[in-house]
Swiss-Prot record:
It comes from the Bacteria. This is Cryptochrome DASH. Disulfide bonds: none annotated. PANTHER family: CRYPTOCHROME, CRYPTOCHROME DASH.
Length: 489
């Protein structure tokens, strides 16, 4: 075997970008040739406990586009991305040995599955005498800069935010994207391409809020368009609860989830916007949302696997139903509640749903149907193009009333929310064509239509559109009693 000069390896994970990438920056500083690797882990394409695809078609295609874009970006700066498939804790050390890597640089993750991979990887590298250096790069605030330890993290977001603001935490500056990299060593490696079944074909629905394209390039373009070309940041707080169209919110979440956009870079651009355009409630609110994302990540660090347990962070032993029939009505958007149905159909057909929609459909599953909240969390995991393990499971804990900030029984009044956030029924008609003829004052509660009105508007309940699967207020009150008494109805 010919002598291979020493090199370093950068292992890309949920950090598919060149900007603000500390592992890449440290590798560059080493002065050695860099090999960049992305490894598709087949476990991420397996099934959830409920038998859903762990990574559904919307997210898998967005991931594939993001990896491809990273490869193109690395090529432009003189390097290349090695793409392979297998268990990273086995595959990465094998590659590292073959290229004579002295050090592996990577970003650290938070939850159990990812941490297990890291630990086993480091174990294998130690046997081979290869150094592993992990860095933190997924949040706005670095955990080392927090005014408390992770174990002392406040259980309420408001206290978390106020403590950070009070201590005037400095956000660390971004690392520059490299303009040139040394080429990776020219060594023939046996790489396993991901199988086509990882990336099922998807059909783009023209009703989608945005034609989401994976990758750093598309993420930066979206930021440029939303902040600078469209000048929409100044109105973010007023429009963020919308549900129709590309620009009611930033829509950065898919790129944040895969690390195509760095939260620190977004923060940096918000601060520039405040200097060059305007500083107002909207600019502050976008930073506020980035802090929510941080909070859920730190909560996951603090509580570990409790996040995924039936009893949640508080280990509350609430009884939950396992009603497959009603779950299927919820999942497919056939509950008879237009706001729930429209949002679930949007999710299924596009991989996206507004934040307002997520809160309402989750509340309906937990507080009206009383179905195991983990079923909903798993369906979101499978479908969402912007799935983020910490935010998803943290939000479901919150909605189910088992999160670390659980207070009195809380639920979303679906009919009222529908009228408040979609007064003319524009969003409902967008996704429920069977209700398109109903006027704005009738569309939110079609179950109240008389036989004459059904005929007048061309909607026959139970035929064209389902009758409600539960009585809204009765089901909420029944659930309230169950949670107060802790017994199954």
């Amino acid at each position: 075997m010919k002598h291979v000069p020493p090199t370093v390896l950068v292992w890309f994970r949920n950090d598919l970008r060149l900007h603000d990438h500390e592992p890449l920056h440290r590798a560059l500083k080493s002065g050695l040739a860099i090999t960049a690797v992305y490894c598709y882990d087949p476990r991420q394409f397996a099934q959830t406990h409920q038998g859903f695809a762990k990574t559904g078609p919307w997210r898998s295609n967005f991931l594939q586009q993001s990896v491809q874009n990273l490869a193109e970006s690395l090529q432009k700066v003189g390097n290349k991305l090695l793409v392979t498939t297998g268990l990273p804790e086995q595959v990465i050390p094998q590659i590292a040995k073959q290229i004579n890597a002295k050090t592996i640089y990577y970003h650290r993750e938070v939850t159990q599955e990812e941490l297990d991979v890291e630990r086993n990887l480091v174990k294998q590298l130690t046997i081979l005498g290869i150094e592993a250096k992990g860095y933190w790069g997924s949040t706005l605030c670095h955990p080392e800069d927090l005014p408390f330890s992770i174990q002392d993290l406040p259980d309420l977001f408001t206290k978390f935010r106020k403590d950070i603001e009070k201590k005037k935490i400095s956000i660390r500056p971004c690392f520059f994207a490299p303009s040139q990299l040394l080429p990776s060593p020219n060594i023939k490696l046996e790489l396993t391409a991901p199988p086509p079944e990882f990336f099922p074909q998807i059909n783009f629905d023209h009703r989608s809020v945005l034609a989401f394209q994976g990758g750093e390039t598309a993420g930066l373009a979206r930021l440029q368009d939303y902040f600078w070309h469209g000048d929409r940041l100044k109105d973010y707080k007023e429009t963020r609860n919308g549900m129709v169209g590309a620009d009611y919110s930033s829509k950065f979440s898919p790129w944040l989830a895969l690390g195509c956009l760095s939260p620190r870079f977004i923060y940096q651009e918000v601060k520039r916007y405040e200097q060059e355009r305007v500083s107002n409630d909207s600019t502050h609110w976008l930073i506020f949302e980035l802090l929510w994302r941080d909070f859920f990540r730190f909560v996951a660090q603090k509580y570990g696997n409790k996040l995924f347990n039936r009893g949640g962070l508080l280990n509350k032993n609430f009884p939950w139903q396992e009603d497959q029939v009603r779950f299927e009505l919820w999942r497919s958007g056939q509950t008879g509640y237009p706001l729930v149905d429209a949002n679930m159909r949007e999710l299924n057909l596009t991989g996206f749903m507004s934040n307002r929609g997520r809160q309402n459909v989750a509340s309906f599953l937990c507080k009206n149907l009383g179905i195991d909240w983990r079923w909903g969390a798993e369906w979101f995991e499978s479908c969402l193009i912007d799935y983020d393990v910490c935010s998803n499971w943290g939000n479901w804990n919150y909605t189910a009333g088992i999160g670390n900030d659980a207070r009195d029984f809380r639920y979303f009044n679906i009919p009222k929310q529908s009228q408040q956030y979609d007064p003319q029924g524009t969003y409902l008609r967008h996704w429920l064509p069977e209700l398109k003829n109903l006027p704005g004052d009738k569309i939110h509660q079609p179950w109240l239509l008389s036989a004459t009105e059904q005929k007048q508007w061309g909607v026959q309940l139970g035929v064209d559109y389902p009758r409600p699967c539960v009585n809204f207020h009765q089901s909420v009150e029944a659930r309230r009693k169950i949670e107060q008494m802790g017994v199954i109805a």
